[in-house]
Amino acid sequence: MKYLALAALVFIAPNLKAQTVENTSYITKTGEKVLRLESVLPIGLQEAWQLFTTDEQLQKWIAPFAHIELRTGGYIITNYDKTKSLADSSSIRLQIINYIEQQLLTLKVKLNNNFSKTVQNEDGNLQEVIQFIQVSSTSTKIISSMIGWGDSEEWSKTYDFFVRGNIYTYEELLKLYK
């Protein structure tokens, strides 16, 4: 009986963790905020990478309209509104600063008109760094860290918006495996 319980922990526990987005945000020693979210997907590293780097897979979870040009200096463009196109001004365009295949994807976050002009003018360092860590041949940890936040009341509101929005988005990703 003891071995059955141990087997259940070994085989079931990793899949239970895959059902949650864990907020592990923190403040660095220099006082900078890091919005950090972690989740474990019950899929291999190559499949997890494709969820972030192919149009078809992005459209399953990030937005109904999504396109990626995977290269340094490339971009991801999305639109959450099914009545609009990627050419519409409401689309969100994230520049790909760099990537290391199946390990790292760094995106430049450019705030749109949903945010105050002040934070839009100060968003030069705002980035999302996405890490892909192989836990096993059938399990991949995703760590999303947003860095480059400003320090004001308006920036606090922007940070809070992304806490809610990013948790929601990564929960949408996890729903593919529930």
Annotated model-derived regions:
Residues 116-163:
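Beta-strand/loop substructures that line and gate deep hydrophobic ligand-binding cavities in soluble
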Residues 1-24:
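Bacterial Sec-dependent N-terminal signal peptides
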Residues 37-39, 91-98, 125-134:
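Hydrophobic/aromatic beta-strand elements that line small-molecule binding cavities or substrate pockets
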Residues 56-91, 99:
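Short beta-edge strand/loop motif at the mouth of beta-sheet-based domains
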Residues 18-20, 147-178:
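A conserved amphipathic terminal alpha-helix motif
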Residues 48-49, 58, 76, 96, ...:
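Hydrophobic pocket/interface hotspot
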